[in-house]
């Protein structure tokens, strides 16, 4: 039995193309892998706090007593990392907002990037500690950006996930959704076709 973590990050709730792909993934995965356990975390509905000067002190051990707010942040970070480590397949619904990922997803990454916990520094350079995972990225975009300099989402996600140890990463794209209903419908249908193949693989 595999455990699957689905992370949603769109601010558009049920109107979101990436959230619709995430829901489709869950349906397809449950049908193909009935015994697997799926956890869905909506980072927009349950937002992660923005890392600031106070909260960063909670994630970097210094021996100083933590404030109540820092204690809450550290407990949340521990919870998120434990959840990440406990799952085998990590599905990230990552729409493109202004050429990059949503703030909600960046806040999540800031809360799980902890030296000595999800990565460590060695004489040979940084080493990721979140290993043995498969990541599937569902990314929707208003325009056409795949394989162009305007796509900052793919290289960033590959870099960050690889940094913490997740190197098995595949992408499913839904592009051109702002070009009109017909284009959006086709983009969603094409993405679902590919996603069904990914689930079956």
UniProtKB/Swiss-Prot annotation:
Family: Belongs to the azoreductase type 1 family.
Native species: Yersinia pestis
Catalysed reaction equations from the record: 2 a quinone + NADH + H(+) = 2 a 1,4-benzosemiquinone + NAD(+); N,N-dimethyl-1,4-phenylenediamine + anthranilate + 2 NAD(+) = 2-(4-dimethylaminophenyl)diazenylbenzoate + 2 NADH + 2 H(+)
Subunit: Homodimer.
Enzyme Commission code(s) on record: 1.6.5.-, 1.7.1.17
TM helices/strands, residue ranges: none
Record's keyword annotation contains Oxidoreductase: yes
Stated name of the protein: FMN-dependent NADH:quinone oxidoreductase
A GO term, aspect molecular function: electron transfer activity
Function: Quinone reductase that provides resistance to thiol-specific stress caused by electrophilic quinones. Also exhibits azoreductase activity. Catalyzes the reductive cleavage of the azo bond in aromatic azo compounds to the corresponding amines.
Chain positions recorded as FMN binding sites: 10, 16-18, 96-99, 140-143
HAMAP family according to UniProt: Azoreductase_type1
